[in-house]
């Protein structure tokens, strides 16, 4: 009992010493970017500007010259194999059987290894990188199971390193091509490639590109002048193809007429022009327009108006003179005796008169630029009916019928294609229909074959005209 009591400590004898806690390990502060570590991003290198030459900036550090990209050609690895010996009668069938069995065993072992690897790598991404072996190369080693050579396995290509436009030249350089040298074994000469240029917008396949380029103004542009001179010469300089700008038509049915641009059609490269004579809006290709100054526009439009006024006044005077002549002739006929009617009629028949050439089914050109404000100027049309020797009715290609057209408003039209039918309108063969054989633009003459007379005649352009009538018509 005494021993047990001695081993038990009393509760009241507790120690009054203070209790303290401490840590023996401290956590180090982690830095996100370590400047001493080589794996971190390198600081940006500063460059300084050295000189400025034109639009080029030269720095202190010279730039490396761009290297020419070369894609080496993959050589074919065809190797010569010794010819197989023909099987002789001494061939051991047992050796052949052993070879077949050993090959089957190797295939089974390879298949088992493959399945084992697939099971082990079940959790791995199934997308594998399959190396491409050079075409025509056989794996090195004794058997077919040996690994391919390292040089036959291509490296992973960096497609961003080679631009698309430089890929073809890089392949040619790898094949041994050099700039300035010909390609070929027998006729190695440099052949310039044919580059097809795009046609100007708005010109189709039937348009003549050379004529459009010839009409386009190619003069040198003027240097800008001071503000005072620009304001002074503002009317002397063309504004260009802009709405409100003055232009002149260079080609087409409205050739030589002036007008102002009302609007532009950039999709079809055409402009809506209001003609100065007649105030009619027409659509013309921009290639057939030339901008003019306001001073030139005012001068030419004034001349056209004066010509129009003089033409109308001449027409009025001509009508008055014709009326006076008719009145005088009627008065003379009343006062002359009846016995003079016979000789007078004979003298009228013997008097020379101008020969008229109007005939039905002739294709003519309208040349009067004052008729209805020049609306039908340089337009091709067909004579529908002849009202009098010098008056006719015509129909345009659009189907419009024009009545009361005089002979002096029209001119004969010679076809361009050889073999087209023409009619002789002046001379002893008037009214004959033949075929055009050839034309001579320098002399304005043409060779015409007349089938009925079976002869070939040379006539002037004014003596023939394109005929659009029935093929079996050949009036005498």
UniProtKB/Swiss-Prot annotation:
Main location: nucleus
Alphabetical keyword list: Acetylation, Isopeptide bond, mRNA processing, mRNA splicing, Nucleus, Phosphoprotein, Repeat, RNA-binding, Ubl conjugation
Record field: compositional bias (Polar residues): 13-26, 210-219
Disordered, as annotated region: 1-96, 203-244, 327-353
G-patch domain residues: 164-210
Limits of the KOW domain: 240-267, 415-442
Modified residues (Phosphothreonine): 216, 316, 473
UniProt GO molecular function: RNA binding
Record-linked Pfam families: G-patch_2, GPKOW_C, KOW
InterPro entries linked: G_patch_dom (IPR000467), GPKOW_KOW1 (IPR041993), GPKOW_KOW2 (IPR041994), KOW (IPR005824), Rib_uL2_dom2 (IPR014722), Spp2-like (IPR045166), Spp2/MOS2_G-patch (IPR026822)
One GO term (biological process): mRNA splicing, via spliceosome
Modified how: Phosphorylation regulates its ability to bind RNA.
Effect of residue 27 to A: Reduced phosphorylation. Significant loss of phosphorylation and increased RNA-binding
Subcellular localization(s) per the UniProt record: Nucleus
PANTHER family (alphabetical): G PATCH AND KOW-CONTAINING (PTHR15818), G-PATCH DOMAIN AND KOW MOTIFS-CONTAINING PROTEIN (PTHR15818:SF2)
Free-text function comment from the UniProt entry: RNA-binding protein involved in pre-mRNA splicing. As a component of the minor spliceosome, involved in the splicing of U12-type introns in pre-mRNAs.
Subunit-structure text: Component of the minor spliceosome, which splices U12-type introns. Interacts with PRKX. Interacts with DHX16. Interacts with PRKACB.
Name by which UniProt lists this protein: G-patch domain and KOW motifs-containing protein
UniProt organism field: Homo sapiens (Human)
């Amino acid at each position: 009992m005494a021993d047990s009591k001695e081993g038990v400590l009393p509760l009241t004898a507790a120690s009054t010493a203070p209790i303290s806690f401490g840590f023996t390990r401290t956590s180090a502060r982690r830095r996100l970017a370590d400047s001493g570590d080589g794996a971190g991003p390198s600081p940006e290198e500063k460059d300084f500007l050295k000189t400025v030459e034109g639009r080029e900036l030269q720095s202190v550090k010279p730039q490396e010259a761009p290297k020419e990209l070369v894609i080496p050609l993959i050589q074919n690895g065809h190797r010569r194999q010794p010819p197989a010996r023909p099987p002789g009668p001494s061939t051991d069938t047992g050796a052949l059987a052993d070879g077949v069995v050993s090959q089957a065993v190797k295939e089974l072992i390879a298949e088992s290894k493959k399945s084992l690897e697939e099971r082990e790598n079940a959790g791995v991404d199934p997308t594998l990188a399959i190396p491409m072996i050079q075409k025509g190369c056989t794996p090195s080693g004794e058997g077919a199971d040996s690994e391919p050579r390292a040089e036959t396995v291509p490296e992973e290509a960096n497609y961003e390193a080679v631009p698309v436009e430089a890929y073809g030249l890089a392949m040619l350089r790898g094949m041994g091509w050099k700039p300035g040298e010909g390609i070929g074994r027998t006729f190695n000469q440099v052949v310039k490639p044919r580059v097809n240029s795009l046609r100007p917008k708005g010109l189709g396949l039937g348009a003549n590109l050379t004529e459009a380029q010839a009409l386009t103004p190619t003069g040198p542009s003027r240097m800008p002048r001071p503000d005072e001179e620009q304001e002074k010469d503002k009317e002397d300089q063309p504004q260009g193809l802009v709405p409100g700008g003055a232009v002149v038509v260079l080609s087409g049915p409205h050739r030589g007429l002036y007008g102002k641009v009302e609007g532009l059609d950039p999709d079809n490269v055409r402009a809506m022009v209001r003609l100065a004579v007649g105030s009619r809006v027409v659509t013309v290709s921009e290639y057939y327009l030339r901008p003019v100054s306001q001073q030139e526009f005012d001068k030419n439009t004034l001349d056209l108006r004066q010509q129009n006024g003089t033409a109308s006044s001449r027409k009025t005077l001509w009508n008055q003179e014709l009326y006076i002549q008719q009145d005088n002739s009627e008065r003379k006929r009343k006062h002359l005796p009846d016995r003079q009617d016979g000789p007078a009629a004979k003298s009228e028949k013997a008097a020379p008169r101008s020969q008229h050439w109007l005939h039905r089914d002739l294709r003519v050109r309208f040349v009067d630029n004052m008729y209805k404000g020049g609306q039908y100027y340089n337009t091709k049309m067909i004579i529908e009916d002849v009202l009098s020797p010098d008056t006719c009715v015509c129909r345009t290609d659009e189907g419009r019928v024009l009545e009361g057209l005089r002979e002096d408003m029209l001119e004969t039209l010679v076809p361009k294609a050889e073999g087209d039918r023409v009619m002789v309108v002046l001379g002893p063969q008037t009214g004959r229909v033949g075929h055009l054989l050839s034309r001579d633009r320098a002399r304005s003459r043409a060779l015409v074959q007349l089938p009925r007379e079976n002869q070939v005649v040379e006539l002037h352009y004014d003596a023939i005209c394109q005929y659009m009538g029935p093929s079996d018509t050949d009036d005498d």
